[in-house]
Amino acid sequence: MTAAGPRRVLVTGASRGLGLRAAEALADRGWSVVLGCRRVGDVGPVLARARGRGAPVSAVALDVTDPGSVAAAVAAVAELGGPLHALVNNAGVFRHEEEEFQDLRPGDALDLLLTNACGPLLVTRAFLPLLRAAGGAAVVNVTSRDADEDTFDGLFTGYRMAKAALNAMTRNLAIALRPDRIVVNAVDPGWIPTDMGGPEAPDSLDAAVAAVAGAVELAGGDRTGRLLRAQRPPGSPGRRRADGATRR
């Protein structure tokens, strides 16, 4: 917390899953949290609970694939007053239908790239003035181990490609934004039991939340351009394919 009040963080895709849990954890750590979600009404109960215990939280409508929505979100966050000390690019999509390459639909391919790669890039660009104003900030991109070449198995090509692009963005922006004291890192949360990951996911949601929150708190430091991984439970089997094999 600073003399002017708590540091502010925006979390995209914060209406459920990892984004919501990370937002709640950051509020508990003393951050002023802005939940970015496509429908603000979805987080009404969350806002009420957080405010009931004195946490400084708010929400803005934000669709990371819509430039108009992004611009409106920037204006809404600016109206809250003060700079933005951290941005968590968590919003993402996964399409089970594209498991086999021949089943990939053009619309899904575009959606994967727009949401998982272009969205974080354009959101970061739009919020750059507010991040610069903090005098030391953090951008955290939620990625996936599916982008690692040693996991390639011929499945989910569009998703892997989009997350690999996100990793390239992370490394390049870490260099570009270093003069502004903005660290840019990626976090691999593992395969976690959320709406996206499914109930059979073997990795720890709590560990993923801790990894994201820890990356946010690197704001103003010098640890940048890194791929940070959540701690995995011993013997975690990785993601199970339809044929019974596993992948991580």
Stretch-by-stretch model annotation:
Residues V88, V123-F127, L131, M169-T170:
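Hydrophobic positions on the long internal alpha-helix
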